[in-house]
């Protein structure tokens, strides 16, 4: 008896399968719901210095004592980055990062014209491992360095 097993579109990350907290569609629906609720959440703001040339800010949105969204914004001479961490209980289930690049450095022209944007969504398992990625809404393979990069992003939450 011969059995042939074919794996299509599966990227091995380690010896254990990576199961995201929610499916991609469920994650996107939860993100959309949470984004619409921010006005109803309590929030606190802290400055984030030393992580970009022009500084940054973090806004933490809470429902009672429960974190729902941590929003980080970093500013630089050639662009800015906007990153949101989405929580289910104490678990981050998704990170969405928007990178914006300016036509010219802000020191040359402070009336910013945007050259390009790129939005990356990272979908995590309950242990913070990246199980899925999309770029501008299109599914992509998980980059080799994604796990370490996401650990650094999470470690930067104040």
Stretch-by-stretch model annotation:
Residues 45-47, 58, 101, 120-123:
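Ser/Thr- (and often Asn-) enriched beta-sheet segments in non-cytosolic proteins
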Residues 60-110:
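Mature extracytoplasmic domains of secretory-pathway proteins
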Residues 117-118, 123-158:
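C-terminal partner/receptor-binding element of secreted or periplasmic proteins
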Residues 4-19:
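Bacterial Sec-dependent signal peptides at the C-terminal "C-region" and cleavage site
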Residues 29, 96, 104-109, 131-134, ...:
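Low-complexity, flexible helical/coil segments
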Residues 16-77:
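N-terminal secretory signal peptides
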Residues 53-56, 78-83, 114-119:
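Short, surface-exposed coil-to-beta transition loops
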